């Protein structure tokens, strides 16, 4: 590993350690339109308390999911066959598509979605919408 990479890793670790010390809320539910929430949980050393990990929704679908949150979360996700993607895609309430881009199979994605969905604390939520890459399609 080169010196630049070592310095960046050192600084990253120091910043994360300082942020963990300053953290007052150890159980947030982060609802993010892309992978950002997973990074935040990881950097702070927190348990994933949200199903919105390793996936993305388009900004339009993300807003629709938030506007109808209970219905969206409580409706089973169905697999989209022949999505044209090389990763699993699901569709939930109101036709909202979920792109499970960091999962190998739909079964794995749904298992994690349902497991983490049980940890949601609706009284301790933070929401983050990203329009990175023109549609939230990159993590």
Predicted feature residues:
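Extracellular glycan-modifying ectodomains
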Residues: 2-139
């Amino acid at each position: 590993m080169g010196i630049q990479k070592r310095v960046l890793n050192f600084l990253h670790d120091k910043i994360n350690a300082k942020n963990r010390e300053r953290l007052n809320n150890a159980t947030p539910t982060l609802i993010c339109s892309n992978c950002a929430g997973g990074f935040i949980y990881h950097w702070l050393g927190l348990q994933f308390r949200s199903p919105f990990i390793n996936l993305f929704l388009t900004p339009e679908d993300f807003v629709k999911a938030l506007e109808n949150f209970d219905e969206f979360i409580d409706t089973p996700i169905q697999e989209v066959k022949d999505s044209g993607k090389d990763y699993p895609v699901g569709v939930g309430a109101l036709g909202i598509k979920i792109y499970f881009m960091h999962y190998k199979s739909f079964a794995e994605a749904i298992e994690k979605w349902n497991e983490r969905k049980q940890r949601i604390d609706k009284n301790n939520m933070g929401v983050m919408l990203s329009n990175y890459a023109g549609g939230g399609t990159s993590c």
